[in-house]
């Protein structure tokens, strides 16, 4: 589904992403892990098109997207959530999701019209709210949601584009155990119908969710494989996981 060929990015003399080859297969939850500063978020930005690459190719569904704009990648079926929550904080949950649906469909939208006048737009927004466990929060202002609820809303914004591949950049960042549990369950539900490329530091979540894992260290992929193989890989343990996860 997604294939990266020798993808690279430099910032001055620093090589943030170094000739990365990566394949994400349709239907999988593919986790990308690595220490802080490994280049994970930069790599996600290159895939999403919010940052230009210096070298290499991005192939998605047999189309080359390397030099396309972010909106063209969204139209092709790529959606992204961010490491730092990115929502319309002054709008309600319903209006956030309706805006995302409208952006995808191109239908007209006005906050000054009654809800009933927008019909299907808000029906779909409510369905997405239910999908991300925010059905009872549709009237709440986004800024008043808990951190975990805001992250779930951001995932909902990504789902509103009807993606074929979702890029999730540390969706559990800053969450407590209960919020993390809910996010894991949400990603499990998403992964049943949408391919997911997941960047995450919570190793318990990664090993529960991922069908395959790639390890990025100093901008390079050092290993890719099933969770059991990654857990047992001596090079991975030395570089990232730690000997305590070897058992």
Regions found by a protein language model. Give the residues of each.
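Glycine-rich phosphate-binding loops of nucleotide-dependent enzymes
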Residues: 1-247
């Amino acid at each position: 589904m997604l294939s990266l060929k020798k993808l690279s990015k430099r910032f001055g003399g620093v090589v943030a992403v170094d000739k990365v080859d990566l394949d994400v297969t349709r239907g999988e939850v593919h986790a990308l892990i690595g220490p802080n500063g490994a280049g994970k978020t930069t790599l996600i930005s290159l895939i999403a098109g919010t940052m230009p690459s210096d070298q290499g190719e991005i192939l998605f569904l047999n189309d080359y997207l390397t030099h396309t704009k972010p909106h063209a990648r969204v139209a092709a079926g790529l959606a992204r959530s961010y490491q730092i929550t990115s929502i319309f904080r002054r709008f309600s949950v319903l209006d956030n999701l309706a805006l995302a649906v409208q952006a995808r469909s191109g239908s007209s939208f006005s906050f000054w019209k009654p809800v009933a006048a927008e019909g299907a737009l808000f029906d779909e927004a409510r369905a997405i709210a239910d999908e991300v466990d925010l059905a009872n929060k549709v009237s709440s202002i986004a800024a008043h949601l808990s951190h975990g609820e805001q992250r779930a809303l951001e995932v909902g914004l990504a789902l509103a584009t009807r993606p074929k591949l979702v890029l999730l950049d540390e969706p559990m960042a800053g969450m407590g155990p209960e919020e993390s549990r809910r996010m894991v369950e949400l990603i499990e539900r998403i992964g049943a119908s949408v391919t997911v490329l997941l960047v995450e530091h919570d190793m318990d979540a990664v090993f529960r969710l991922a069908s395959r894992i790639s390890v990025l260290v100093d901008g390079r992929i050092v290993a890719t494989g099933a969770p059991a193989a990654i857990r047992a890989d001596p090079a991975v343990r030395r570089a990232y996981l730690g000997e305590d996860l070897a058992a």
